[in-house]
Amino acid sequence: MEDLIKNDILGEFKFKNGAWVRLMDNPVLNSKGNLKLVIQDTNKEGILDIQREAYKTYLQNEERYKSCVTDYLLDYYKWNNEVFMNSVSGIDETYYKDVITEEKLFTTMTLWYLFICRDGSFGYAFGCCWDKENGIAVLLSESEPRVISRTQLENLHKLNDNTFSLLIHDNERYWTTWDELSFFDETIRVQVEVEGSVEDGVNNAQRKAYNDYLLHKTEHLRRLGNFLLPTYLGSKAEADKFIAAGQQVGVKDVMPSRLVIDKKGNYGWICYTQWDDSYLGILLSEKDIHIMEVNQLRDFAKEKKMKDEKCGYLFREHNFWSQTILHRFFKGEVNTMRVAIRTYDKNPTDLQLQKLSEFFQYDNKFWEPMKDEMLKYYLKFYKDFEDDLEIPEELTPKNVNRENVVSILTFTSLFIGISGRIAWLCESPTEEDGLAFEFTDGKVELIFQPEII
């Protein structure tokens, strides 16, 4: 077949990179010059009738598409503003989601071409500054336009399902759609990711899981608030009193971003955590909420894990069993922390699990004695490290106190050794090998980290 063809309906095209390409008659939105028309033909078999009809449909509705696409892009930008803000440097407050304008939005992206897929689906493809590899696209040919990635448009796989409605594959692992969720005083969009290949589609366990989620999603938000409350109050006992009194709890620092449903029907949210500008996996499909790393949620059915009645899920990691927990050290900022139980090639012992369970029952009663231990250590060894560090005035022996001395610590993990010894491990500028706060019989002792690990 020739590399140049002329069609009465479509015009004259040149074949390039698996598609027929030509310039259209006019610019569209913020395209640089006349908009490019790209018609997919990977195997160079010629333009299909369904693609010609798709182009006619586009021309008949072009003005409507141009008028609505900006609204869809603005909504998408607002729902994904954290991703943009974290990916692009040198931006100012005019790009915040509450004040973003159409003019500002189009400084972040450029319309490249109208793309017509082999099945007649079509949409606008954009380059964007926050994802240069995958870009962004608006699929226009559906009953309601859908914002997807440019790579999804160019390798489009669609599935119309009675439970999920229109699903679009991400060309990696998931079928995707969107759901809306009332979150405090706003409505947020949660991307739904249903595990499955292009060939396999989705299964009944996943449909059942999604129906269950839709039925209980408001309840899941309430459960999440109750789960987080002990961390914020610093006491499980206080949290239980609060909840027993019927008071409603909401935590805005943890915002659902994605709903992941695996092949077995396990499901949970991937939540944005404001305190560390990161993400956390939250399993929702069981009676109790469990938090974990994002990849542990995504691979939940495949992960090597165990569930303890008191401690919850533990995941196998090399010579350890690990768990993700949340803590507010000294009633400061919330931290996402890791429990590490050293077992080598065995399962945790009853003693190790008992120590972990007992630790959770102390309701942060350790924090005050930890301050005393740290101050005692600091004053005792001050002469050993004062020449090696730049000591601020407030941390000199004259001014240091039990409240500010702990500011030099960075906690890294809660460690449980083979023998059942348990301690918070932390980094300190005063000790190259780190410090540890060991808990024994309800008491705290500060030791050098190598003594326990």
Segments and roles (model prediction):
Residues 1-19, 25, 94-189, 248-334, ...:
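Acidic, proline/glycine-rich low-complexity IDRs
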Residues 1-92, 161-243, 308-392:
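Long, contiguous N-terminal structural blocks used for assembly/anchoring
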